[in-house]
Amino acid sequence: MLKTFNSSARSCRAMPRFLPTLCSRLHEKSGFEIRNAVRMHSVGSHTHTHDHGSDKEMLELVKALKKEGKSPELKLAWLGLYSNIGLAAAKGIGGVALQSSILVADAAHQLGDTLSDLVTLATLKICSKKPTQKYPAGFGKWETIGTFTVSGLLVAVSVGIAHSSLSRLYTILFPYAGSEHTHIGHSHNPSQLLFEHPFMALGLIFGSVVLKEWLFRKTRTVAQKTDSNILLANAWHHRADALTGMVSLLALSGTYFLNAPWLDPFFGCLVSIVVFSAGFNSSKKAFLQLLDRAPSEELRIAVTDALLKGEKLPYKIVTILGNAHAMHVIISVPPSFTSQQSSELAQKVEKTVLDAIPALSSCIVTPLSSDSNQVHRWQHLNGSSGEHSHPSHEHTH
């Protein structure tokens, strides 16, 4: 019976890893309100319909990383990272000692948060490298590969959670069949240690909820003072951890005090669907980026806004290609321009974009004569007579 409970515990804790991601993506488009996280939750995207809103979050993260090492944003970011490591260690030791899958799963969740943050920081460091002779377009796709890998693992974990939860739920609902059902390396007998010391497990989870809620409030306060979007996203990560920790706490309490072991695998099944949706949508987005899909509207707005605020020059933006780390901007110039004038204009546009968007390590600007066949081809592809006219274009959010 406890084994069933343990299985769902694992599933319940898988939810936290996904919820923070959802809350972060969503805050970008919804003013960081938790209700958006719930909505995104149901859609199951960056669930990017989270689109990982991610490009905007990535731009904000790079801004924060470029600040001084003692900035409030980085201090709290590292505090959150250390708290995840501490919680993972405490829950892992407690879970093994009490033979509690819910604590072990909780520890895995905290460790998953930590690994995800480290992967993000590592890929950002790689992506920030300047283009080389071997990689003239920069290293921007490393971030996409990292996202694709982590999302793939998330999908695999969700499938494992679903299988384990359904198996234990079946055993509880049909005990006559479950009595003959065994797994290699374990049985479905309840853990006596956990039932003898339930408050130790409950205390560890409750403590993590309190810590995460405290981190949420402190981080949100600093984020509002510093007007830091990325820090506000991080705050909602902590709130999501606290809320989903409450779900695990309720599942564990119900299993023990109400003698309802089915709660754990039941919640595990629901969570596995949400986790799978998150992983699938993030993987899909990363896969499409590897296929050089058009950049998100967020990136296009960032580039056009940067150019609108820059020096007024005689050109039009034909199209924008690339990702949050490496962009390719094609512009049209007057037919009367010489090759030297076009080259100088392209250099000015490139500098304007790179200065305005710190996340970019590479920006290639290709000038084309406005009466050339290539410009007409791009205009036809974009379905317009010209994407943007820089001198007169008015952009609104």
From Swiss-Prot:
Keywords: Ion transport, Membrane, Transmembrane, Transmembrane helix, Transport
InterPro entries xrefs: Cation_efflux (IPR002524), Cation_efflux_TMD_sf (IPR027469), CDF_Transporter (IPR050291)
Domain of life: Eukaryota
Membrane topology per record: Multi-pass membrane protein
Annotated GO biological process: inorganic ion homeostasis; intracellular monoatomic cation homeostasis; iron import into the mitochondrion
Entry keyword DNA damage: no
Pfam (any one): Cation_efflux
Subcellular location field: Membrane
Segments traversing the membrane: 142-162, 191-211, 242-258, 260-280
Any one GO molecular function term: iron ion transmembrane transporter activity
Signal peptide as annotated in the record: none
Main location: membrane
GO cellular component entries: membrane; mitochondrial inner membrane
Family affiliation: Belongs to the cation diffusion facilitator (CDF) transporter (TC 2.A.4) family. SLC30A subfamily.
Protein name, as recorded: Uncharacterized metal transporter C1020.03
